[in-house]
């Protein structure tokens, strides 16, 4: 009863922090000058992380097993993983746009956990015999940590694609508008307003420099986080193979979850290969990461909707 009450309190606190965090996050997106609000959002994510940690420990204490047996618990751990990734650049005091991605991921995932799932899904369950193993913590935690890192890195790549394509569309529209103007009109305007032209050119140059710096930063962080996630995913798949051999007598069975996990691993292996090829631009790598982002969600949610295969232990279970 004490554990249930404590979990209930922590759930409500985390929901309140998430609600406040979403409000502050939306405000800071439109008003960049309010530094105090941004700091409050950062502290809200840390508070949410502490609540999630308390929730995981509480469920572990009264269930008797590591809380990774259903969708609710796996999403809790996913939110916790997002918060961990978020706090690395935060405590290093580096101004990085990776925090925007990780904080929003933490807030919205935890919002889904606390308000988007039915109460029946939030109940702790007795482990089925196949899950009663010490490999549960190793395998599933590595998989979810890998998913979290890969999702964050992929979202940074998506942001890179948005900025790049917006720039390309803007250049195309400017060229189209320039062709509509007559050469004589442009020449007269340049002669009459040379100072304005210089100021405009200087402003455009500084804006392009800032955009290039932002793209470079997003590309660098995306590569680092995806590399980390790929390591976690590899460890998770290998540990799962060892566990499968102990439980089912075979290292690999090609059921839907295993197949899509392998597809996910292959997609991000291709991403890392493109990073080593100097002929590939960052945009090409970002497109591969975007495809990987879609595949992760198919593997995480879509396969479980089928309810078939060796990894199916009921509706919406992760592993």
UniProtKB/Swiss-Prot annotation:
It is a multi-pass membrane protein. It holds the Pfam family Cytochrom_C_asm. Keywords: Chloroplast, Cytochrome c-type biogenesis, Membrane, Plastid, Thylakoid, Transmembrane, Transmembrane helix. InterPro entries: Cyt_c_assembly, Cyt_c_biogenesis_CcsA, Cyt_c_biogenesis_CcsA/CcmC. GO terms for biological process: cytochrome complex assembly. One of its GO terms (cellular component) is plasma membrane. Coiled coil: none annotated. The keyword Cytoplasm does not apply. The chain crosses the membrane at residues 9-29, 44-64, 71-91, 143-163, 225-245, 259-273, 286-306. It is found in: Plastid, Chloroplast thylakoid membrane. One of its GO terms (molecular function) is heme binding. HAMAP family: CytC_CcsA (MF_01391). Belongs to the CcmF/CycK/Ccl1/NrfE/CcsA family. Required during biogenesis of c-type cytochromes (cytochrome c6 and cytochrome f) at the step of heme attachment. May interact with Ccs1. This is Cytochrome c biogenesis protein CcsA. It comes from Oenothera biennis (German evening primrose). The gene is ccsA.
């Amino acid at each position: 009863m004490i554990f249930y009450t404590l979990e209930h309190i922590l759930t409500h606190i985390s929901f309140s922090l998430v609600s406040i965090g979403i409000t502050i996050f939306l405000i800071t997106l439109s008003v960049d000058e309010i530094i105090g609000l941004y700091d409050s959002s950062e502290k809200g994510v840390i508070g949410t992380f502490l609540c999630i940690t308390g929730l995981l420990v509480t469920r572990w204490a009264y269930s008797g097993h590591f809380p990774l047996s259903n969708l609710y618990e796996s999403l809790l751990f996913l939110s916790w993983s997002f918060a961990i990734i978020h706090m690395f650049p935060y405590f290093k005091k580096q101004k990085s746009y990776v925090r925007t991605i990780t904080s929003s991921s933490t807030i919205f995932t935890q919002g889904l956990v606390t308000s988007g799932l039915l109460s029946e899904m939030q109940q702790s369950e007795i482990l089925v015999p196949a899950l009663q193993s010490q490999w549960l913590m190793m395998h599933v935690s590595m998989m979810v940590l890998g998913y979290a890192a890969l999702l964050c890195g992929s979202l940074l790549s998506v942001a890179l694609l948005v900025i790049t394509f917006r720039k390309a569309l803007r250049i195309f529209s400017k060229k189209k508008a320039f062709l509509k103007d007559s050469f004589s009109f442009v020449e007269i305007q340049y002669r009459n307003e040379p100072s304005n032209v210089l100021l405009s050119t200087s402003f455009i140059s500084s804006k392009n420099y800032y955009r290039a710096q932002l793209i470079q930063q997003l590309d660098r962080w995306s590569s680092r986080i995806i590399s980390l996630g790929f390591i976690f995913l590899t460890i998770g798949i290998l540990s799962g193979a060892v566990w499968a051999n102990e439980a089912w007598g075979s290292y690999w069975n090609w059921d839907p979850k295993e197949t899509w996990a392998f597809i996910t691993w292959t997609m991000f292996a291709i991403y890392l290969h493109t990073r080593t090829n100097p002929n590939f631009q960052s945009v090409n790598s970002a497109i591969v990461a975007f495809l990987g982002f879609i595949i992760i969600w198919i593997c995480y949610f879509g396969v479980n909707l089928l309810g078939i295969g060796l990894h199916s232990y009921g509706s919406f279970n992760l592993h």
